[in-house]
């Protein structure tokens, strides 16, 4: 017997600073669907997920709660595992970066970097974003904030170890160019090459000495290992790399697919490959950066408070409707919208009307006309061939779709068969055949073809919607559900008993359910909504230091290579100034030209994205940063006027 093909897929390991949201669920459900599909095809497949538990942010949250970091993450991790159980995630291993085996392996990895001369000790001085666990230079900041998440950064200076990233940059560029599928989609590959690698890599800070919640460096224990070095190593330490038990590593590495969100693809396609090169290990075969789930047009984020709780959706609608929406409605590789109304309408149209109706009608007719017993297909006609051919060709189409990570298209192909089977019922009119005793054999053949088509549907749908696939198999008493069995349209045994059972997907009153969800969301917001804490008290002398002036916007244009910055030329009492402002997500340049706004006029000039900014435009934002408004000034107030 030949050895099974191997398949190793990973999700990111999630940062347990709070409960996970539907965006995190998306990555994990997609990975689960892919690994289940490979198992169906007979692969020896392994799925890894887990949690990234170290770092300054976790330590601060735990301190605020008066508990240890480990106690805090233990509680969050339990919730994550419960969520994956609810979502029917079939992972093979859940790694925690606090696991002893991982800690020891990471220490060995860093020691090897040190022994090979890849890291050195120096001092770091710059800006640090605690939520992102990222370091930034002055020129990389946007309006003095983190360019990734837009939150405040802290000035930090401390002794640290650095990795010589530039040593491997040319080698990585060549590897990416020689392996066009290594980074996908194509747009992500181009971004990594043109925005990060080719302009030149800076050495990476890989340790911290200002806090202690992390893995200690064995040869300098006042340092803990920077969280990304710790986290990225999980993909090999989970398999036993660096331990005495490395059987899984030898079996499954290199990974076939790292599936990650586009916001962390830089770490997975630059830092991680360079780490592997330094360790003289093979690189993963592919890193795929999917898009974001957007709510009301904006990115979903725990910090913004606009997250969709998957537990609420599961409790209201069940697991498979949530999986279906995520897998089918989000273009894989692009951003997608999560919307309650679209979600419920898709349940009604695709799951209840198309699939649920087909199963119910088929089972009901077999019960009604043949006492629940499937008849042999002895009276075939030409009209049967299109349905049969579509079923037989389905596995090959799905195989091609999954190889290219076209998950929505794979579900489309399954639904093509579902819709064709529904049309087949209308074409063959079983209820008319049932009235003619001489047509009983033909009626039995039609119903056999429907059950056999549903065998193809149930078998291929199970990786994507596990509960639904199993329910169909149970109702129709499907016994043969292997990939090999899909090579022929004859896997249903005549004489098999079927039972109609419960409706798989009841229809939902859209307006009523949306109203219920909106009320539930408002209650949750009320429970969590808090005013931002006031800043420390200042004196009137501090207020007097601010020079707030009315200015008029003369010109405005986007800043190249920035998603947030606009460059404004403003007039201040006869003087012209250039100001950069991070408001491009809220204003088009043409909307600002001619407006009078408020400027902090005596702010020390600074360079942002390499361009001079002589002041700061004042604006007010909602708590979740989803909306922002400049302070508009009446036209009759002259520029240069003091705002008191």
Swiss-Prot record:
According to the record, the signal peptide region is none
Entry EC no(s): 6.1.1.10
The Gene Ontology biological process terms listed for this entry are: methionyl-tRNA aminoacylation
> Which catalysed reactions does the entry list for this protein?
tRNA(Met) + L-methionine + ATP = L-methionyl-tRNA(Met) + AMP + diphosphate
Which PROSITE patterns did the record assign? AA_TRNA_LIGASE_I, TRBD
Motif: 'HIGH' region; annotated at 14-24
Q: What are the annotated GO cellular component locations?
A: cytoplasm
The record describes how the cofactor is bound as: Binds 1 zinc ion per subunit.
Domain of life of the organism encoding this protein: Bacteria
Residues holding Zn(2+): 129, 132, 146, 149
Cofactor(s), by name: Zn(2+)
Gene Ontology MF, one:
metal ion binding
Which Pfam families has this protein been placed in?
A: Anticodon_3 (PF19303), tRNA-synt_1g (PF09334), tRNA_bind (PF01588)
Write down the top EC class of this protein.
ligase
Under Gene3D superfamilies, the record lists: 2.170.220.10, HUPs, Isoleucyl-tRNA Synthetase, Domain 1, Nucleic acid-binding proteins
**Similarity annotation:** Belongs to the class-I aminoacyl-tRNA synthetase family. MetG type 2A subfamily.
- Reported function: Is required not only for elongation of protein synthesis but also for the initiation of all mRNA translation through initiator tRNA(fMet) aminoacylation.
**What name does UniProt use for this protein?**
Methionine--tRNA ligase
